[in-house]
Regions:
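Short, small-residue-biased leader/transition segments that mark boundaries at the very start
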Residues: 1-6
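Short active-site segment of divalent metal-dependent hydrolases/proteases
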Residues: 7-8, 79
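Post-HEXXH active-site segment of zinc metalloproteases
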Residues: 10-25, 90-93
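Histidine-centered, transition-metal-coordinating active-site segments
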Residues: 28-214
Length: 214
């Protein structure tokens, strides 16, 4: 249920960097802000401590205190790298054959196979255990896959060029709304008038919510 209420900011990591540049921003803290301060027209969702802990610690150096939160954290890791790889393949930055053979052998040669391998590994190694975890072999393969993605996708000049466009777009949006707050939706204009939040925070709230519907 928690994963349904927080969404990634537009353009993923590039969007997060842009929002952090114009105003200190971290998506896990923003996710908690959404469920506490923005949803239900500012009333929040009145979630339990356990759910809020899972949201805040789903992708930080901290660790969720509940098994449910640990499931969210590890699921985020699995989905993140597989979605990025799938996007890179569909975008022509990578092909399946570019993935090192040892990683294809360990994890699978398609997005579906990799996800199945990772999910089954987590289930098998977490059964009757006090923590949610992967096997050491699969965790090593995941680290190697992440290193491969950094070298070939995240730092790829073609991908970086598109990210730079996204960063510039978000920075322009921020500057525009900072100068023209009258065009913000009603809930954000009311927040400007009635809350103690800084104007920059409220503009970040609006831009960070620009996901699929925009």
């Amino acid at each position: 249920a928690a994963s349904d209420v927080y969404k990634r900011q537009p353009f993923g990591q590039a969007g997060e960097r842009a929002l952090n540049h114009v105003y200190h921003f971290a998506h896990q803290k923003q996710s908690l802000r959404v469920v506490e301060r923005i949803e239900k027209e500012g009333r929040g969702l009145n979630l339990t401590w356990e759910v809020r802990d899972g949201i805040l610690n789903h992708q930080t150096s901290g660790h969720p205190h509940t098994l449910e939160g640990q499931v969210v954290r590890i699921s985020d890791k699995l989905a993140y790298i597989n979605h990025d790889m799938d996007d890179a393949i569909r975008g022509g930055i990578l092909t399946e054959d570019d993935i090192p053979s040892d990683l294809r052998q360990a994890l699978g040669s398609s997005c579906k196979e990799r996800l199945n391998t990772l999910v089954h590994d987590v289930i098998t190694n977490s059964m009757d255990q006090p923590v949610i975890k992967m096997s050491s072999e699969t965790e090593r393969a995941m680290k190697d896959l992440r290193k491969f993605m950094f070298e070939n996708v995240y730092l790829n000049p073609n991908a970086k060029g598109e990210e730079d466009k996204a960063v510039h777009m978000i920075e322009q949006l921020f500057e525009y709304y900072a100068e023209h707050t009258e065009v913000l939706p009603r809930i954000f204009k009311e927040a400007l008038e009635n809350s103690d939040d800084e104007k920059e925070q409220i503009i970040c709230d609006y831009i960070a919510g620009m996901t699929d519907s925009y």
